[in-house]
């Protein structure tokens, strides 16, 4: 059985020799293991062995979020059903958001039909605590067009948008929990660690891609704890000074104490802007509102949710949503995170 490990802490992009050495010692990534297994299932003999093994070792299988399943996930569900296990799959086609990860929600109906699943629809949600929020969700699912009531961001518990960029443009009283969807860039990862210190200070919650930033920088858990006092000092500097170039240099020096990644010698305008955005929010006297995208908000709930939508997204909402469009499903998820009320936060209210 191959062992699965995280990317080596000293290699942001491991070379071929390192990969071959790791594989020869029985180490691989989770994705490597999935790829090998998926390929092996194409061989009839292997499928038979897996089916028999499932029948011998398991009685039942419960799969949540089935509409986020990729090809391998669906293949295993099929095998479990063929092996005679009691298989239950749970999911909402309106909340399938992970096509970029290989999810295949369009294949789920065929799976449940071919495997003769009995469908039981759930019509009650314990999230809604107000009739209007329950009505909004029902009408969205029915494809009815919507014009949301407007409200200021300050009265909401969270602001949700479909893109991180929209959240950073939402004003100094909104603090998004990420800069963008990836932290593969070294300096982007360093800025994410500073952002994470701010979000922990303000919301008791780490930045969305905090763990990814540590991996990009090759920083272990223990090293991250040693680094925190330096990062907290940098946050204090951002709050008290407008010299972000000086803060950038201090950030580079701090991160260099715990990583051997090659840090840039000159500041890039994008990363200076990142620090300036944080500085502006730290000096803001009003309550900060956390900002999340629909992807990060999925599965969570708040009492009052504000949404920031583009003109094009508002136009789509007025026409009505369709479950077969991922962009429409993102809007549905954003608009159904509130227990009591969802409001549109227009640009002139930010």
Protein language model annotation of sequence segments:
Residues 1-350:
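The feature marks helicase ATPase cores and/or their adjacent C-terminal helical subdomains
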């Amino acid at each position: 059985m191959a062992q699965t490990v995280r990317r080596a802490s000293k290699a942001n992009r491991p070379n071929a020799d390192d990969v071959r050495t790791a594989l020869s010692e029985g180490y691989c990534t989770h994705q490597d293991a999935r790829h090998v297994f998926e390929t092996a299932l194409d061989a009839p003999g292997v499928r038979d062995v897996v089916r028999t093994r499932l029948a011998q070792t398991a009685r039942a299988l419960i799969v949540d979020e089935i509409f986020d399943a990729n090809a391998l996930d669906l293949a295993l569900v099929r095998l479990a059903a063929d092996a005679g296990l009691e298989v239950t799959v749970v999911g909402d086609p309106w909340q399938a958001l992970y096509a970029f990860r290989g999810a295949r929600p369009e294949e789920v109906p065929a799976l449940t039909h071919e495997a003769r699943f009995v469908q039981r629809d759930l019509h009650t949600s314990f999230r809604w605590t107000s009739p209007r929020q329950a009505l909004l969700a029902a009408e969205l699912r029915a494809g009815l067009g919507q014009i949301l009531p407007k409200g200021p961001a300050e009265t909401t518990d969270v602001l949700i948008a479909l893109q991180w960029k929209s959240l950073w443009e939402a004003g100094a009283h909104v603090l998004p929990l990420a800069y963008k969807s990836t932290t593969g860039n070294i300096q982007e990862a360093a800025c994410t660690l500073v952002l994470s210190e701010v979000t922990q200070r303000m919301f008791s919650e780490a930045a969305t891609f905090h763990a990814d930033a540590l991996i990009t920088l090759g920083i272990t858990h223990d090293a991250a704890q040693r680094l925190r006092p330096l990062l907290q000092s940098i946050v204090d500097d951002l709050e008290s000074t407008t010299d972000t170039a000086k803060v950038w240099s201090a950030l580079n020096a701090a991160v260099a104490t715990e990583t051997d990644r090659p840090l840039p010698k000159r500041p890039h305008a994008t990363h200076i802007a990142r620090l300036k955005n944080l500085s502006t929010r730290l000096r803001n006297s009003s309550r900060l509102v956390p900002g999340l995208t629909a992807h990060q908000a999925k599965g969570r709930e708040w009492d009052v949710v504000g949404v920031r939508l583009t003109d094009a997204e508002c136009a789509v909402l007025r026409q009505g949503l369709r479950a077969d469009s991922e962009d429409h499903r993102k809007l549905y998820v954003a608009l159904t995170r509130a227990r009591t009320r969802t409001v549109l936060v227009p640009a002139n209210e930010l």
